[in-house]
Regions:
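Alpha-helical transmembrane spans of integral membrane proteins, capturing the lipid-embedded, hydrophobic core
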Residues: 37, 41, 45, 49, ...
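Short hydrophobic helical membrane-anchoring segments positioned at the boundary
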Residues: 313, 343-372
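Long, contiguous internal "core" modules enriched in hydrophobic/ aromatic residues
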Residues: 124, 144-271, 275-276
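Membrane-interface extramembranous regions at the lipid-water interface
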Residues: 3-43, 58-92, 129-158, 176-211, ...
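Alpha-helical membrane-embedding segments
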Residues: 96-111, 147-160, 171-179, 215-233, ...
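Membrane-helix interface segments in multi-pass membrane proteins
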Residues: 2-6, 60, 101-119, 218-270, ...
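Selective recognition of hydrophobic, aromatic-rich stretches within alpha-helical transmembrane segments
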Residues: 49-63, 107-137, 166-187, 248-281, ...
Length: 372
């Protein structure tokens, strides 16, 4: 459901430092290009291969700095302050754990299982720390973001929620989505100011109903074609030798197509659900209790962009991946906005004057990214 029409870049620029009109959402934009990002991407790929993956940490920094810097709100881009060494150290710790785990699992299976259980206990803490790291290395107008969520909230949002959703075959997925967005949104800070969101479970279920309908309809179509070829499947079950070579080939093609359709159905449903839930959660969010956020992604358009991006990337053996990433970033940014209550210049001046809860010592002492 489209909640508001996109604003032109000119309109956004005019509102950069004045009072935002009532109901006027300032849209984000993405100023990068596929051609420009391709140069960064290809160097990242080549250096990652040459260094046997070590450079991937610095590749992540270069990629994020490009996308953050080209994500523009009110004429100013975001900044990404992480360093490659921080990301590399975190990855080396995780890599060392995996080596120890596999060694123990091979020679002392019980110890390996115990180490796995210990790791699972630490997952909520790692998730909370990862979100904290990502927030704290991000800034806008020289003011850092922060994340204050605890491991207990991460356990509910990222462990309990997915388990409940899986056990109920997705019926309680909206509840899990609500927990996740509330955990992230209610613990995010910009300077000393807090974000908050409380998405309606009923509205999320409306998005879920659309995805559920896609799955049911898709499975009915697959089931119908399977019924038409019931004789072939029945013969194959009774004895594969009874099938001719042509029928065996046809059966193989049908099975492959069935798998493709299965993943396509659930993939499309997941994308439709993701866009819908994002719209609900972002549009229910506020900043500093009075500035409203907005997301009005078109479910159909978002799904088409995501699927076509994957297809184009596969067909071109990955060479069009930069174009696909820029295409998605541009679309999502253009359908994300903020409505400021008051004079924008005064709002950001006050936030900058208050300062940030994140000190420079975080980058030197605590700042490691474990990839969660």
């Amino acid at each position: 459901m489209v909640l508001a029409e996109p604003l032109s870049a000119q309109k956004v620029g005019q509102g950069s430092f004045g009072r935002a009109a009532q109901g006027d959402f300032q849209r984000l934009s993405f100023t990068g290009s596929g051609k420009e990002y391709f140069g960064i991407w290809i160097v990242n790929v080549l250096l990652t291969i040459v260094t046997l993956g070590i450079y991937s940490a610095w590749a992540k920094v270069r990629r994020n700095r490009y996308f953050y810097g080209n994500t523009v709100l009110l004429g100013r881009g975001f900044e990404y302050h992480a360093r490659g060494g921080q990301i590399l150290i975190g990855r080396l710790i995780v890599f060392a754990y995996l080596i120890i785990y596999n060694i123990l699992l091979t020679f002392v299976p019980l110890a390996g299982i115990a180490l796995l259980l210990l790791f699972l206990c630490f997952v909520p803490w790692l998730v909370a720390r990862g979100l904290r790291f990502s927030a704290r290395v991000t800034s806008y107008r020289n003011v850092r973001f922060d994340f204050v969520g605890r491991a207990g909230g991460a356990f509910l949002a990222f462990i309990v929620g997915p388990v409940i959703a899986a056990l109920t075959l997705g019926i309680l997925a909206p509840l899990a989505s609500r927990w996740t967005y509330r955990y992230i949104g209610n613990n995010l800070r910009y300077g000393q100011k807090a974000f908050s969101t409380d998405p309606s479970i009923g509205t999320i279920y409306k998005s879920w109903a659309i995805s559920a309908a896609i799955i049911i309809l898709g499975l009915l179509i697959v089931g119908f074609f399977a019924f038409l070829n019931f004789a072939v499947f029945a013969t194959a079950i009774e004895g594969p030798d009874l099938l001719s070579a042509e029928m065996q080939m046809s059966l193989g093609v049908l099975i492959v197509l069935g798998y493709i359709l299965f993943f396509a159905i659930f993939g499309a449903a997941a994308l439709v659900y993701r866009a819908g839930v994002r719209n609900v959660a972002w549009s229910a969010a506020t900043f500093d209790g009075k500035h409203r956020l907005l997301s009005d992604l078109s479910r159909l358009r978002y799904t088409w962009i995501a699927i076509s991006n994957v297809l184009v990337t596969l067909v071109t053996l990955g060479l069009m991946r930069p174009w696909a990433a820029v295409r998605m970033a541009r679309y999502v940014n253009e359908h994300t906005g903020v409505r400021f209550d008051g004079n924008v210049g005064e709002i950001f001046a006050a936030i900058a004057q208050e300062g940030s809860a994140v000190g420079a010592e975080f980058m030197d002492i605590e700042g490691f990214d474990f990839g969660f």
